[in-house]
Amino acid sequence: MIILCHLGEEHAMSAGGVDQKLGNPLHLRLPLDCGVKVIGAHCASEGDNVDFDDKDLKKTSNFKLFLRLMDTPKYKDLLFGDISSMLLYTRIGEPLTTILDREDLHENLVFGSDYPVPCIGLISRTDKLYSYGYITNEERLLLNEIFECNPLLFDFVGKRCVKSPETGNKFPKSLFGINHKLFGLNSNNSNNVI
């Protein structure tokens, strides 16, 4: 069994209010401790939540709580992070750079789009990706053209283009295919089909 759940703050759904406490990554410990594989949407890259490990229950960024779980050895084969919405203007900076630079996490990342969110031009900001150094101006112009024709393709190509402004690291090509580790497949066998 694999559980896909939203982590971090939720902004797309506001009907009736959203309890942001439900996006706390530390809530995943129970299913993880039971051996269930979990995909955390957006790598919990927005908002803050209570740190249950802190005696004073201080608020900590959801992203840092998620990374703590990702760095827990017993969860290495169970916890995965989805990179959907990682190019939105609210995640540019520490979350995106960290995920690009932490190559040790790449085999535990899965591609996702969070469709239809990337199709909203106001939050898909190539100017910010460019100004932070994730893409070149030429890539920015090309991505803008792609967005006008196909916003979903824009999201895919954008994730293939971005590089860390600090190290130049990119998402590995393997991230855009089947995650063999997630599905327990032999990555050396090209006949693995889900």
Feature-to-residue mapping (PLM):
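Divalent metal-binding pocket/active-site signature
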Residues: 1-61
